[in-house]
């Protein structure tokens, strides 16, 4: 969908502008065979891929570097339990259209479901005087929580028509940066116009703006990728794709969005991630090598599968 510049001030306030800039462009196609091979190695108990080289996972570091979504802020949660759309509107915005009047004979007027534009214009034409300037929500942790939950569900499906949701761009770029399996060739990138605003500069995902397309049959590729993952060695893994030391986060070939490093102090948090009804734990201590740190021993085994996945916020 073509981006409309009139949205910019409203998208920039909650910290979503870098991500919207990214996804409003043409993003690389999903390599379904690689995703399926990764799902086979996902463990919902640890929220990590169990590979021959050890555990690996998508962390808040990857969320910042690839999407630049804000991590710090209010959790993205709301009640999802209601008796209908009117009750949901009242819970979210404090009001809803009135019920249709009852006609003679006990029947209600037939009206379309949802709030009509005339009602929206009458009630929201002007910003309330007591409205907050901005509310920053933790969209980054919500995106990771939902991706974790989708991987949790997908790895336990037994039907052939099962799928997976969440931010597949985040998962794809994470995989391409770290693993040689199914990695496409990055040829170049389209021109990026940041309009002179550093916040509109690209994220790390821009490295994969234009990639080679997968032409082989999916089932054959899946078998090939499965074999390649079974033979992975630590030397083949790019443990720190974003660099290390003073060169960390330097793409060398283009200027990156400054927001990607703004919340680096939060990347090693062991905390619950919340996305509405999904609550998932962030466990970076299990993959310390991804942060350039020494992993002295395997973390203690804690099975969160049953207890954690009973938690719901709605």
Tell me the role of every PLM-derived stretch.
Residues 1-314:
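Structural stabilizers in ordered domains
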